[in-house]
Amino acid sequence: MIPIFIIVHNQYEILKKSVESYKKYINTPIEIIFHNVYSTYFETINYLELQKKKGYKVYDSKINDHHTVIDSIKDYIKHHPICEYIVITDPDIELFNVNSDIIEFYIFLLNKLNVQSVGPMLKIDNIPNFYPNKNQVIKGHTNQFWSKPVKSILFKNTNYQYIECSTDTTFQLFSTKNIPKEFPYKNSIRTLAPYSAQHLDWYINPNDLYPSQLFYLNNTTKISHWNNKKWNGKYYNNNINIINNFFINKYKYIYYYNKCKCKNNYNFGDFITPYIYKILFLKDAILDINGGSKKEDVIIGAGSILSSCNSNSIIWGTGFMFGNEKINKPKKILSVRGPLTRNRLLELGIQCPENYGDIALILPYFYYPEIKKQYKLGIIPHYIDKEKFNKIYINNDENVKIIDVTESIETVIKNILQCEMTISSSLHGIIVSHAYNVKCMWIKITDNIGGGTFKFRDYYGSLKINNYNTLLPYIYDKQISTQEIINLINNYPNPTFPINTKLIIEICPFINIKNKIH
């Protein structure tokens, strides 16, 4: 039995395809083992949990470092001392039309040629034209690998070709007595067809992505031939991927509320839709101040701003503020924030699909920094509540973080991620906490928030949570302990994490996503 260690970090569709290829093409008995490198994407997490239930071994790393796979391998060898060989691979290496004795061939080469590892050459003759960096890949791999001398070796009465070159984690077979301490390594070979492989990242169409691919490409700091490249005179890396330069821009007008009476007129929840737009297209959207007065279509997204729509508005995840507004019929409704908003639209004779979800829930697709927990509790007052909150709450607990919603979106996200759990009188404080798998409790500090409780009830309805209640400000007046608040949060209804947000991203009006609902 040959163990195949697959290093996983947020891949899903590609991972499944690679696993299927190993089961299909390898006739040697294998054991597939997953090494999870701090994955945060919900489909990846759920997939790995399912594999555990099926009996597969899943190692979990608490840090995003693929070198941690070495520790997992050492642990495996410790418990399987008779294991002689092991395969280490990234999740995007697919075996395609290879001879089924590939493992047997690799063991033969490893011993015959006395090298540290054996793996496949990556095909470059079938990379599709829609892959933006096709020419760079071909040139780079030709210079690095294909330009090297090709050698032959006889195996089972047939000559097969290989190249002596450095390797990393592209389906590499090792002896368990010679496991590397780090990658890459030089004393290795790569085999040509019929023992080659495909690098699935090179077959991604930027205008026909799976949701998992969008999440992965925007949240991975280094992917071979995708980012860390120079484009338009700038380097885009660390969560802004050069793939975004190739998205087809379907809409350029957005309506969002930008007149809040707070610091710099900036409430982070109001700017979520233009933030997503800029991540996608690396430029600002055009603000339509009237919600659809232009000749071109206007996207209305995050916020309680549905009452601002017009006949050429496209509604994506927005909601009503009060629940009794009358509106112009929009051009199209893709989704709304929750069922209360939908019910009001139906009362007005406007058809609305049962597609729910605030746009803030998909922020992790575009920005998911690695942040260590530093606080037991985060408190997120609505900007309208800030003055009263400062009077009734004195923060003298080093375990508590006060989060300011008038800071930038990325700052608020980072601050929330620093906390083990939160309480919030800001709706988007609650939603963003949930989006990043942080337990949150809705609190009420004043009666001054526009719309009262409608938008909160609308959002909770989208999660099918009905047994919530507001926690009144007396908890501050009595200055109950942080631990008492934590106990309350632990008993407060929260969604099952991670939240399934595929529907919201699949109907994103800005780009084409596979499995898109029309």
Go through the PLM ranges and name each one:
Residues 241-518:
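Active-site anion-handling motifs in enzyme catalytic cores
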Residues 66-73, 77, 94-187:
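Conserved catalytic core of nucleotide-sugar-dependent glycosyltransferases
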Residues 1-20:
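N-proximal low-complexity "stem/linker" segments adjacent to membrane-targeting elements
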Residues 140-243:
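C-terminal catalytic/acceptor-binding lobe
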Residues 20-30:
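Short, acidic, metal-binding catalytic loop of nucleotide-sugar glycosyltransferases
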Residues 82-96:
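Short beta-strand-to-loop acidic/aromatic patch adjacent to the donor-nucleotide binding site
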